[in-house]
Amino acid sequence: MMTESEFIRASEALFEHIEDQIDENGWDFDCRFAGNVLTIEAGDGTQIIVNRHTPNQELWIAAKSGGYHFAEQNGKWLATRDSRDFYDVLNEALSAASGEAVEIEEL
């Protein structure tokens, strides 16, 4: 398990990476980071929320498809419920919101 400061640094790097990937690829999303929350809004107003839950060292995604909790396991963020990869879930949510294929590369 990471220390709290390591978790915060890792999650901030991940949030920055997501924003950079969206900007570099020109996908139609607005990103806002405030506190522990990265809000990604599609052109039609659909939101995908990515946040960190520091006490449990989890990343959470909230999207139309549902809510997901991810814990770090061997260098990957995997869903606590079904072991789905963070990037798979995020890319599916972003693709559904934008109506085009979105592929955020792993950090």
Curated annotation (Swiss-Prot):
Taken from the UniProt entry, a GO cellular component term is: cytoplasm
The secretion signal range is: none
Kindly indicate whether the keyword Metal-binding belongs to this entry.
yes
Query: GO MF terms on file?
Result: ferric iron binding
One family from Pfam that matches here is: Frataxin_Cyay
**InterPro entries recorded:** CyaY, Frataxin/CyaY, Frataxin/CyaY_sf, Frataxin_CS
Question: What CDD domains has UniProt attached to this entry?
Answer: Frataxin
> GO terms for biological process?
iron-sulfur cluster assembly
Which SUPFAM superfamilies does this chain map to? Frataxin/Nqo15-like
**What keywords does the record list, in alphabetical order?**
Iron, Metal-binding
UniProt record similarity statement: Belongs to the frataxin family.
Function field: Involved in iron-sulfur (Fe-S) cluster assembly. May act as a regulator of Fe-S biogenesis.
Q: What is this protein called?
A: Iron-sulfur cluster assembly protein CyaY
